[in-house]
């Protein structure tokens, strides 16, 4: 009996050790790699609620270690991740730390002002993307890349896995249709992490004038494009779980139509419907909720299809 118990304990220990060995280590967890770079620097961060190192935000970790964080740039949905899609997020102050949150869209050029850019020496990027051409976080990153080149600022990108990084799909964007929901000549599902995409932007000369930026990327460890990565935190209000993230590349196209895609429900991008789509057994009613204050077909009974029961493989 004792031998059996000992064998069981040894097997469990071996499994735990292997699991720890195979665990994906995010860029921001590798503090020994980037803390020396930050010494004596005035730091700005481009992040939001996803920029977590374990149970602490990158901002809090930097401040606890006495680094001089002077500014925050936040993307669509804001630094705390609770603003609506497309909602203008103005300059403010982070209530928890007192660090200024600077606007990304100042003046006629819709980019950070000269005064904002002169506040810091180095920009840290730590944000969770989902690997789609129309997901706006990478577009904000590209805008910041451009202005960092203009003001000769170094950029440190702490990379994270791409939850849709196991495949590439869709046509490459015709750049005459470049917009706020399509910024680079890449497929709809591009398969890259933000770090890989940033390196590609540099390598392909995609910044205006083919300018290069001073970029360092702290890559993930134990991550490959065959790795199935479950996001620990929803990246935005209407992508609350992996089902929404997996369906988003397909269902998002219908946002240009009057059809509701479940914004204002518990199943955003997992259902679709319209008041006039009679004949379907499934129905739902979009409501005003945080992250979807005024969703399409607000307070109207929509008939349609529930995709939430599909398997991830489908």
Question: What spans do the regions from the language model cover?
Answer:
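Internal helical hairpin/lid segments
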Residues: 241-314
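Glycine-rich, charge-decorated loop segments at or immediately adjacent to ligand/cofactor-binding or catalytic sites
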Residues: 81-86, 156-178
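Glycine-rich oxoanion-binding loops at beta->alpha junctions
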Residues: 90-120, 132
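Bacterial Sec-dependent N-terminal signal peptides
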Residues: 1-22
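Short internal beta-strands
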Residues: 68-77, 158
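N-terminal phosphate-binding or glycine-rich loops at protein starts, especially the Walker A/P-loop
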Residues: 23-67
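Conserved anion/nucleotide-ligand pocket segment
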Residues: 178-251
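Glycine/threonine-rich flexible loop motifs
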Residues: 129-141
């Amino acid at each position: 009996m004792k031998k059996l118990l000992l064998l069981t304990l040894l097997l469990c220990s071996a499994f735990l050790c292997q699991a720890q060995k195979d665990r994906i280590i995010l860029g921001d967890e590798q503090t020994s790699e980037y803390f020396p770079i930050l010494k004596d620097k005035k730091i700005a961060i481009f992040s939001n609620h996803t920029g977590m190192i374990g149970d602490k935000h990158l901002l809090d970790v930097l401040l606890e270690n006495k680094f001089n964080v002077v500014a925050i740039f936040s993307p669509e949905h804001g630094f705390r991740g609770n603003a609506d899609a497309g909602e203008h997020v103005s300059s403010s102050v982070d209530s928890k730390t007192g660090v200024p949150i600077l606007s990304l869209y100042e003046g006629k050029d819709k980019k950070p002002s000269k005064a904002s850019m002169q506040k810091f020496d180095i920009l840290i990027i730590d944000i969770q993307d989902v690997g789609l051409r129309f997901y706006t976080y990478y577009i904000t990153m590209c805008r910041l890349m451009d202005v960092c080149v203009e003001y000769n600022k170094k950029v440190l990108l702490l990379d994270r896995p791409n939850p849709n990084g196991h495949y590439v799909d869709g046509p490459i964007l015709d750049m005459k249709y470049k917009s706020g929901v399509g910024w680079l000549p890449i497929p709809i599902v591009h398969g890259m992490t933000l770090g890989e995409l940033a390196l590609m932007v540099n390598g392909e000369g995609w910044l205006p004038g083919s300018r290069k930026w001073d970029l360092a990327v702290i890559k993930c460890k134990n991550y490959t494009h065959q790795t199935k990565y479950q996001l620990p935190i929803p990246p935005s209000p209407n992508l609350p779980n992996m089902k929404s993230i997996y369906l988003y590349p397909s269902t998002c196209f219908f946002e240009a139509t009057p059809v509701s895609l479940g914004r204002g429900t518990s199943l955003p991008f997992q259902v679709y419907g319209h008041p006039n789509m009679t004949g379907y057994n499934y129905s739902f009613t979009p409501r005003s909720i945080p992250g979807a204050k005024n969703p399409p077909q607000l307070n109207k009974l929509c008939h349609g299809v529930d995709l939430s029961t599909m398997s991830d493989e489908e």
